[in-house]
């Protein structure tokens, strides 16, 4: 019996940790080549032995055997599906009904949120919030879908009184980066962590003495190595994607948490500014 089928059939018997492992494997089956049991254990907040026992429960000798089998099953399934239906996004195909599409999208986003939240180091997050709160100036960088997340964060921070520079144009991003000073903060948003424009800006910011905070994936990347602080995000999207939907969901969960943490840090004044902003925009209607 195929391991994916075994996972589905045994789901009612899984413990909480086993369910976490099962959800992770199904959501990230296309990326398992680069996943070790150690990395997975850290990401899910469980022990490596739990992952090995899960593999053995399904009939594999260990995680490596299970991982390789799942990779093979995924490749075979992809070839079969590709021959009969068009991939529209992630696991969604042209054969799916709107109801099925809705369920798949919802689950994809749920998993991105669950797995991203499971990674939070709250002590480090509090430190990052304090660093941002003391920054005289904040620059936010990002490309594509990450740029949309960056723009949203910039609007939120400006609303509560922070001096923020956000500009989608990469030349402007680079220009602002080289003008940062010690004490300033650059928030770089990039899931891959390898976009040359974002890496260039991070290098420039570090050279000027600014603090670089990266919102990125767990993968080793140039941005991750440059950053003073990292906030990890997880997305189960495969190569079959039409847009970075669950990636943006994960990134937004991080930026929203940063915003609320900053509001909490200076709650009275922040709430006054939010109220004034609301009153002003109401007058524009």
Swiss-Prot record:
Listed InterPro entries: Homeodomain-like_sf, HTH_RpiR, RpiR-like, RpiR-like_SIS, SIS_dom, SIS_dom_sf, Tscrpt_reg_HTH_MurR, WH-like_DNA-bd_sf
Example GO molecular function: DNA-binding transcription factor activity
Ranges of residues in domain SIS: 128-268
Domain HTH rpiR-type: start-end pairs: 1-77
Superkingdom per UniProt: Bacteria
Pfam family for this entry, one: HTH_6
Gene3D superfamilies cross-referenced by the UniProt entry: Glucose-6-phosphate isomerase like protein, domain 1, Winged helix-like DNA-binding domain superfamily/Winged helix DNA-binding domain
Keywords: Carbohydrate metabolism, DNA-binding, Repressor, Transcription, Transcription regulation
PANTHER family: GLUCOKINASE, HTH-TYPE TRANSCRIPTIONAL REGULATOR MURR
Summary of the function given for this chain in its UniProt record: Represses the expression of the murPQ operon involved in the uptake and degradation of N-acetylmuramic acid (MurNAc). Binds to two adjacent inverted repeats within the operator region. MurNAc 6-phosphate, the substrate of MurQ, is the specific inducer that weakens binding of MurR to the operator.
Protein name: HTH-type transcriptional regulator MurR
Species assigned in the record: Shigella sonnei (strain Ss046)
């Amino acid at each position: 019996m195929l391991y994916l089928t075994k996972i589905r059939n045994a789901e009612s018997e899984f413990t909480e940790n086993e369910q976490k492992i099962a959800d992770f494997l199904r959501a990230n089956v296309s990326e398992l080549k680069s996943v070790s049991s150690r990395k997975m254990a850290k990401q899910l907040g469980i022990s490596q032995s739990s992952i090995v026992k899960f593999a053995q429960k399904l009939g594999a000798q260990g995680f490596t055997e299970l991982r390789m089998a799942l990779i093979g099953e995924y490749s075979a399934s992809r070839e079969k599906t590709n021959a009969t239906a068009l991939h529209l996004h992630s696991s969604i195909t042209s054969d799916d009904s709107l109801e099925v599409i809705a369920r798949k999208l919802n689950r994809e986003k749920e998993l991105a949120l669950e797995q991203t939240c499971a990674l939070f180091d709250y002590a480090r997050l509090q430190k990052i919030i304090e660093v941002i709160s003391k920054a005289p100036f904040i620059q936010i960088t990002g490309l594509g879908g990450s740029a949309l997340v960056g723009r949203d964060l910039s609007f939120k921070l400006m609303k509560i009184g922070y001096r923020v520079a956000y500009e989608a144009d990469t030349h402007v991003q680079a220009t602002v980066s080289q003008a940062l000073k010690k004490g300033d903060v650059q928030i770089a948003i990039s899931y891959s962590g390898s976009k040359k424009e974002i890496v260039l800006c991070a290098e420039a910011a570090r050279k000027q003495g600014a603090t670089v905070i990266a919102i990125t994936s767990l993968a080793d990347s140039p941005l991750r190595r440059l950053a003073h602080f990292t906030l990890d995000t997880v997305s189960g999207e495969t190569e079959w994607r039409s847009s970075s939907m669950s990636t943006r969901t994960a990134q937004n969960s991080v930026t929203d948490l940063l915003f609320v943490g900053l509001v909490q840090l200076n709650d009275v004044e922040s709430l006054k500014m939010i109220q004034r902003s609301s009153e002003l925009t109401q007058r524009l209607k």
